[in-house]
């Protein structure tokens, strides 16, 4: 139940951020001087190596995906092992403490 409320709250925050972001952008663009300074800074400090950053970002994503997959499989096998041993213990009738 808590998960659904959390999802609803995040969805509302996302919708509000999307709805109000153009309004804030228009409000910021109304003043000409900060725009000129902002655009000058943006073009003056352009990224010299965008390909390198993209490549690094791809590598980081692959590492995160691989790590998540391995962790998920390990957790699933641990839960399955615990469930099987609990079912066997229930069927046999033993009440021994599980090893940790």
Swiss-Prot record:
Its main location: secreted. Glycans are attached at residues 85, 94-95. Expressed by the venom gland. Residues 18-50 form a propeptide. InterPro entries: Pilosulin (IPR049518). Residues 1-17 form the signal peptide. Glycosylation is critical to maintaining the aqueous solubility of this protein, but does not directly contribute to its activity. It is found in: Secreted; Target cell membrane. Keywords: Glycoprotein, Membrane, Neurotoxin, Secreted, Signal, Target cell membrane, Target membrane, Toxin. It comes from the Eukaryota. Not detected in the venom. Neurotoxin that triggers pain behavior and inflammation in mammals, and is paralytic and lethal to insects. Causes a time-dependent increase in cell leak current. May act by targeting membranes. This is U-myrmeciitoxin(01)-Mg7c.
